[in-house]
UniProtKB/Swiss-Prot annotation:
Binding residue positions for Ca(2+) 2: D57, D59, D61, T63, E68
Pfam families the record matches: EF-hand_7
Keywords per UniProt: Acetylation, Calcium, Metal-binding, Methylation, Repeat
Modified residue annotations for N-acetylalanine: A2
Family: Belongs to the calmodulin family.
Name of this protein: Calmodulin
One GO cellular component term noted in the UniProt record for this chain: myosin II complex
Positions with a binding annotation for Ca(2+) 3: D94, D96, N98, E105
InterPro entries reported in the protein's UniProt record: CALM/Myosin/TropC-like, EF-hand-dom_pair, EF_Hand_1_Ca_BS, EF_hand_dom
Residues given in the record as Ca(2+) 4 binding sites: D130, D132, D134, Q136, E141
Binding residue positions for Ca(2+) 1: D21, D23, D25, T27, E32
Domain of life: Eukaryota
Organism in which the protein naturally occurs: Pyuridae sp.
Length: 149
């Protein structure tokens, strides 16, 4: 399944993996997974975190290594995000609930994830998703961005 990913996708997932892998040991533990989920405004229980890891933990060592992470991401991309998941993600970014994601809101969420972006990088991300050119991302643009592979 992971063999259907492009090199670009694999590079992106490598970056995402290192956001999760806080101590840089090459594996994601339930503790690290919990930290990232909470920074995204989620509040999973220990049991839910364990379930998430068990779903993809092919070698049964209780952690997720990069190949397992790739499998998980490939699987997630295949059953493309449900409407509800996309709406939920949009709400995480749209801090003030005005129906738009501004550069400041995007920067805030990315910083919470431990991803320090330059203003240029944030502006570039907004530009890529901002179809109508108003300088922010509305829900339709967000859906388009999330569902275009």
């Amino acid at each position: 399944m992971a063999d259907q990913l492009t090199e670009e996708q694999i590079a992106e997932f490598k970056e995402a993996f290192s956001l999760f892998d806080k101590d840089g040991d090459g594996t994601i533990t339930t503790k690290e997974l919990g930290t990232v989920m909470r920074s995204l405004g989620q509040n999973p229980t220990e049991a839910e975190l364990q379930d998430m890891i068990n779903e993809v933990d092919a070698d049964g060592d209780g952690t997720i290594d990069f190949p397992e992470f790739l499998t998980m991401m490939a699987r997630k991309m295949k059953d493309t995000d449900s409407e509800e998941e996309i709406r939920e993600a949009f709400r995480v970014f749209d801090k003030d609930g005005n129906g738009f994601i501004s550069a400041a809101e995007l920067r805030h969420v990315m910083t919470n994830l431990g991803e320090k972006l330059t203003d240029e990088e944030v502006d570039e991300m907004i530009r890529e998703a901002d179809i109508d050119g108003d300088g922010q991302v509305n829900y339709e643009e967000f859906v388009t961005m999330m569902t275009s592979k």
